[in-house]
Structures are given as C-alpha cells and as structure tokens.
Swiss-Prot record:
Entry protein name: 2-dehydro-3-deoxyphosphooctonate aldolase
Family classification: Belongs to the KdsA family.
Keywords attached to this entry: Cytoplasm, Lipopolysaccharide biosynthesis, Transferase
UniProt xrefs under InterPro entries: Aldolase_TIM, DAHP1/KDSA, KDO8P_synthase
Top-rank lineage group of the source organism: Bacteria
Catalytic activity: D-arabinose 5-phosphate + phosphoenolpyruvate + H2O = 3-deoxy-alpha-D-manno-2-octulosonate-8-phosphate + phosphate
Subcellular localization, as worded in the UniProt entry: Cytoplasm
Pathway listed: Carbohydrate biosynthesis; 3-deoxy-D-manno-octulosonate biosynthesis; 3-deoxy-D-manno-octulosonate from D-ribulose 5-phosphate: step 2/3; Bacterial outer membrane biogenesis; lipopolysaccharide biosynthesis
Any Gene Ontology CC annotation: cytoplasm
EC number: 2.5.1.55
Keyword Zinc-finger attributed: no
HAMAP family membership: KDO8P_synth
Gene Ontology molecular function, alphabetical: 3-deoxy-8-phosphooctulonate synthase activity
Source organism per UniProt: Caulobacter vibrioides (strain NA1000 / CB15N)
Length: 287
C-alpha cells in the first residue's frame, strides 16, 4: 500500500457545521471556542448543555465546537467515574450535531477507536499524556478528521513540532496544537505564555486550554483538584498574547460533576467570560 504523502499544516483549520458557515480556527482569525463538560454523563445532560452553549454562541457571534468525553481513561483512581462509554455515546454525538448545528469534539485513547469515533464527531483530540504515541496519532490522522493535540505536561513547546509532524506526515494538514500547562513540582501546573508564540512557529493553529491549565493533578488524593477562579485570568492572558481558540470546560453544576469539577466554569458564567475574551481578541488582532 502506498504511504501517505507528508503535507504542511494548514494555517487555518475549517470545521464544517451541519447547517451554517464553518468554524475557522486560525491564529489570525477571530477567536473560536471549544467548550462543554468534561465527560458525557447522559444524553439529557449532553443535549441540555449543548443547547445552552449554542444559544450563547449565537448571541456572541462566535464559532463554537462542543466537546465532551465518552471515556475518561486516565482518571486518578480506578474507581472514578469515566463516562458512558464509546458505544452509547456515538448516537448522542450525532444527535447533538443534528439538533444544535454545532460541530463536535472528543478525545480518543485507543487506536481502534479512531475510525469509529470519526463517524460521529468532527474533531478528534489526543490527550496530553498520549501526545507522543505515534500509532495513536497516525490512526487519528488517517481518519481525515481535524486533530487537536494537547501538549504533554512534560513537553517543551518546541517539542510539539515533532508531534505535529506525525499527523502531517500521515497526510493530514488539519491539526492544532493545544497548550494546557506544564508540570511545576508536585500536583501543580504552570502556564508559560512563551509557549504560544513558540508553537505558532510550527505553522498550525494554537489552542489554549484555560481549564486544565488550572488543574491540580491528583491534588485531592483520589481525584484532581483545581482553581477555577484563575480560568479568566489565564484565558485573558493567552488571548492577549494571541491564539486561534480557547478551550473551556463548562458544566451546569461543576461542584457536583463526576470529574474535573474544581476547574470547570459554571455554564451561567460562560457567556460573560467569552464576551470578555472576544473583546481582548479584537484588540490583539487589530494591533
């Protein structure tokens, strides 16, 4: 079988929507948003959250991709809730696209899941812990879907050039690099804003994950902690530096969420946060 031809990364990744204009993700484009709850808890929860985010995105005039995870395979504890699973989630992802018009994103942990997930979502995300797994990157790239790669907490930003090359080397130019903090001692992450312009030099859109950047990995013993009060601060800083997209996990009741509650933004606060980020984005990109 012929090997795929290596390509350069696209400066702008277009994510088609079921009913409207595509979401254009590019470092020089208007800010776009990836948002949704950490994990898919139920059909009702997923649809209600997606509808709320769609309404806010329409009011703000911002391109939004709905994200949620069918399986949180890297939870701190083996006893932690992981999500509803691949089989039960596929129809829900498709329903979200059909009834809201939002494109969708989810993360994969297994090479065998990539082609299955690609039938139901628009963007495949590679978790930070798995960002150097060549077989997973190639399997995801081979689906033809856009790929969002979380930079590992253990990687320097310039090391993402080799990670991105695994996707483009498989013939897929639609790839994004996502900053989500770097390990800074035990149970702590820090966001180095120098990473954003460094990763831009790769030539792909750069995403800033504002919620996992405030995570405290394993900080609660059997689960991760977080400091959601710093999400707006870090998000504003990233947008002031200049990014293509901001990733924000949001939940109607984060304090009672099954995972990542301490760093998720309440849905009721989401619209004001994004409205403020759009003002920063307009100033940054007008300069």
């Amino acid at each position: 079988m012929d090997q795929p031809k290596a390509v350069a990364p696209n400066a702008v990744v277009e994510i088609k929507t079921p009913t409207g204009a595509p979401v254009r993700i590019g470092n020089g484009e208007k800010l776009s948003i990836i948002a949704g709850p950490c994990q898919m808890e139920s059909r009702q929860h997923a649809l209600e959250t997606a509808h709320a985010l769609k309404e806010m995105a329409d009011r703000l005039g911002v391109g939004l991709i709905y994200k949620t995870s069918y399986d949180k395979a890297n939870r701190t504890s083996a006893n932690a809730q992981r999500g509803i699973g691949l089989k039960d989630s596929l129809a829900i992802f498709q329903e979200i696209r059909e009834v809201t018009g939002l494109p969708t994103l989810t993360d994969v942990h297994e090479t065998s899941h990539c082609s299955i997930v690609a039938e139901a979502v628009d963007v495949i995300q590679i978790p930070a812990f798995l960002c150097r797994q060549t077989d997973l990157l190639v399997a995801a790239a081979s689906t033809g879907r856009a790929i969002n790669i979380k930079k590992g907490q253990f990687l320097a930003p310039w090391d993402m050039k080799n990670v991105i090359a695994k996707v483009t080397g498989a013939g897929n130019p639609n790839v994004m690099a996502c900053e989500r903090g770097a390990s800074f001692g035990y149970n702590t992450l820090v966001s180095d804003m120098r990473a954003l312009p460094i990763m831009k030099e790769i030539g792909c859109p750069v995403v800033f994950d504002a919620t996992h950047s405030v995570q405290q990995p394993g900080g609660q013993g059997t689960s991760s902690g977080g400091q959601r009060e710093f999400v707006p601060t870090l998000a504003r800083a990233a947008v002031a530096v200049g990014v293509a997209c901001v990733f924000i996990e949001t939940h109607p009741d984060p304090d009672n969420a099954p995972s990542d509650g301490p760093n998720m933004v309440p849905v009721k606060e989401f619209e004001a946060l994004v409205a403020n980020l759009l003002r920063y984005d307009a100033l940054t990109k007008a300069a």
